[in-house]
Swiss-Prot record:
Gene: foxi1
Annotated segments matching region Disordered: 1-24, 210-269, 344-363
GO molecular function: DNA-binding transcription factor activity; sequence-specific DNA binding
Compositional bias segments (type: Basic and acidic residues): 231-243
Domain of life: Eukaryota
Descriptive protein name: Forkhead box protein I1
Entry-linked Pfam families: Forkhead
Matches recorded under PANTHER family: FORKHEAD BOX PROTEIN, FORKHEAD BOX PROTEIN I1
GO biological process terms held by the UniProt record: cell differentiation; determination of ventral identity; ectoderm development; nervous system development; positive regulation of DNA-templated transcription
Listed Low complexity bias regions: 1-18, 244-258, 347-363
Length: 363
């Protein structure tokens, strides 16, 4: 730092005279960061010691704790009076903040010098929920029960933060008492005069309160929900109890047969729809039309006679059995066949089905 220039009229005549500088001399003005030394006036070499070491300065009785230094030193052997621009309270003893106490872990907060321990408690909100404060107050009571006003009193006395505004946190405490299942209301006895009921802590919830951490007890589920969940679990464990619906169902519901004799039920896969019955009937009509004709397709006629005749015999037997189930199936047999009889002569293919000739033009 540059030395502070002093006015000419404040200097003594002896200090205004030029003196030769020596290598071992200390500078006229210096600032020691460790000791917060303020600049001093220039003195004659005969008035100061030959060497000034830092260890020679005495430390004050009450240091500045947040810097860990030696504090401001107003050594009378170095300067008879402080500089006029320094405030008189700069080197005044400071009050130590937060004495050693196990609650704050020794001098962890000793670097703060703005307020005392009580002022800190008023500024900082306690790290406890309202339910924890209520449980703490009830546990500290002699008979483990307190009224609402006694809970207010305990919170305000032990936590000065809540002394500032009482309306807000008192409403929160009332809501926690009424909504939390761990707090039980106990009516007053007849011989106990006073106003208001007592509040106590549920014995099942006492273990849940541990060092200010209060976990709210959940309400048990209703019996209906538990029974429903148990039923769903049984259904998943025993899937064989349920019967799966058949993969193939008949086209129409089965009705009791008018005939007295009993018959064996047919499997679902053999049930025929009206569309299939109509198709087989049309094929039977085609077989009847081609049986009286002679054409070049002899092998085809023979195969068709064999296959369709067997189908017709099977249909004739099944149609009698299904006459009661499908009374309108005769309409399908009376219809004209979908396909006409096989042609006796070969027909010419349409032009769009014929293979196109190769392109004979020039490329």
């Amino acid at each position: 730092m540059n030395p502070v220039q002093q006015p000419a009229q404040q200097r003594s005549p002896a200090s205004s005279l030029p003196h030769p500088k020596r290598a071992q001399e200390a500078p006229d003005m210096a600032l020691y960061c460790d000791n917060f030394m303020y600049p001093q006036q220039s003195l004659h070499p005969s008035q100061r010691g030959p060497n000034f070491a830092i260890g020679e300065y005495t430390s004050p009785a009450n240091p500045y704790l947040w810097l860990g230094g030696h504090g401001v030193n107003n050594a009378p052997n170095y300067s008879p009076s402080p500089a006029p621009y320094m405030p008189p309270s700069f080197g005044a003893p400071q009050r130590q903040f937060l004495p050693n106490s196990p609650a704050f872990g020794g001098t962890e907060l000793s670097w703060m010098s703005a307020a005392s321990q009580e002022e800190l408690l008023k500024m900082v909100r306690p790290p406890y929920s309202y339910s924890a404060l209520i449980a703490m107050a009830i546990q500290h009571a002699s008979d483990r029960r307190l009224t609402l006003s006694q809970i207010y009193q305990y919170v305000a006395e032990n936590f000065p933060f809540y002394k500032k505004s009482k309306a807000g946190w008192q409403n929160s405490i009332r809501h926690n008492l009424s909504l939390n299942d761990c707090f039980k209301k106990v009516p007053r006895d007849e011989n106990d005069p006073g106003k208001g009921n007592y509040w106590t802590l549920d014995p099942n919830c006492e273990k849940m309160f541990d060092n200010g951490n209060f976990r709210r007890k959940r309400k048990p589920k209703s019996d209906a929900n538990s029974a429903k969940i148990a039923k769903i679990g049984e259904d998943h464990l025993n899937p064989k109890g349920k019967e799966s619906p058949p993969m193939i169902t008949p086209s129409s519901p089965e009705e009791p047969s008018p005939t007295g004799h009993s018959k064996s039920p047919s499997p679902p896969a053999v049930t025929y729809t009206p569309c299939l019955t109509n198709f087989i009937g049309s094929m039977t009509a085609v077989d009847a039309a081609t049986a009286n004709r002679q054409g070049p397709l002899g092998l085809l006629n023979e195969l068709s006679q064999r296959n369709i005749s067997s189908l017709s015999s099977f249909i004739s037997g099944s149609a009698v059995d299904q006459s009661a189930e499908h009374p309108d199936t005769s309409l399908f047999y009376n219809r004209s066949p979908y396909y006409s009889s096989f042609p006796t002569t070969a027909q010419k293919q349409p032009q769009f089905l014929q293979q196109p000739p190769l392109y004979q033009g020039r490329y």
